[in-house]
C-alpha cells in the first residue's frame, strides 16, 4: 500500500516537472518570437526611413522624419498620448508651475479638427464667447486642419496684451465666426461660492488645483456661518470643469463620503503595470452633515470632475443634474526623454466605486436638464461632443477590471489627470479671501438666467418640503 502511494507521488512529480519544462520552452519560444517580431518592425522602419532619405523628391531632415514617426505612432493610440519636443515639454512645465500668457482654452483634436473641450472661466476665451465643441479653423489665418496640439498651443500662447485671431466653426452657424482675442496672464481660480437663498449654498469648482481641497473646506465653513451654522442644501457646480489634480478631486469627495467608522472608496485606477493600480479611499473621521447635495455637470465636465460626480452618485450622496459628461476616464503619465523631450502616455483607466468605467461614456445625470435660456428654445451647449467622438479614443472595454483593493495609504499623492495636453493645472492660486467676492462670483441676474441652476434650487427646496410633509403624516 505504501509502495503504491510512493509510486503515485513519483508519477505526479514527473508529470509536474514535464509540464514545467514544456511551459518554459513555450515561454522562451513566445518571448523569442516577440523579440524577433520587434526587430523585424524596427528593421522595416529603418528601411523606410532609408528609402525616403535616398529617393524622396526633395532633401529631407532625418530628425523631422523620426519625430513624424513617433507622432504617428502615438496618435494611433489615443488623443491624449503625445510626444513633446524640448520646447513643448518646457511649455508644459511653465503652465504647470506658474502663470502664462494665453487665451484660457482646453483643446483636443476631433476628426483632425482642433476642438474646444471647454473655455476656462474668466479668461479671454470665455469672456469672448468661445464654447465647448467649437472647432478652431484658423489661428491668425493659419489653417489648423491636422495641426499638432503642441503647435496650436504655442500659436495661441504668447506675451500678455498681444492679439490672436481665432476663426471658429460652430454648429448652427451659417458662416465662420471671427474672434479677435487679447492674450492675458492665465491665473485660474480654483473655486467660487455664495449663498443663493437662506440655507442653500452654491459652490462652483472651475478646476482641481493644488489648494482646491483646502479652499473647499474654508468655503463650506463660510457658507455655514452665513446660514446660522448649518446648510439645508448645497449645489456643487462642476460644469465646464476640465479636471486637474486627482488628489484634489479625492480631497473634495472626502468631505462628503465616509464617516468615523467607514473609509468609503472614491475611485480606483487600473492599468497593465502594477504601479498603475491605485485605490483612493475617503479618510475615517468627521464629515459634512448629511444635508442634500445636487451636482451640476455638462459636456465640459471631464476627468477629475467626473470622479467627483461618479463617487457621489455611486454612494447615493448626491443627485446629479445636467447633461452627459465628457467621458475622459484615462490617466496620463509624464515621462522624461533624452534631449529634454517628454512623453505623455496613457497608462491607466479609472473607475467609479461600483466599477463603472467613465472612459468614452461619461457620467449620466440622474435628472437630464438641458442648458436652455428661459424661453426654453435655445440649448446653450451648442455642440455636445464627448471623448467617444475623438479619433482613436480608448474604449471602456467589455471586461470589468479587477476590483478595488485596500490602499496602502488613503489620499494618495497628487497625480495630474490632463484632459488634453493643451495646459495643465496652475498651482499659483489666489488665497480664498480673493476668491470669495460675491459680486464677481454669481450675480442674482446670472442665477435667474441659469436654467440648470434654477432646477437644482427647485430640487433642494422640494426635498425640504417633502421631508416636512412626511413628518406631518
Residue ranges, per PLM feature:
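Flexible, low-complexity junctional segments that flank or bridge functional domains
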Residues: 1-234, 240-244, 262, 417, ...
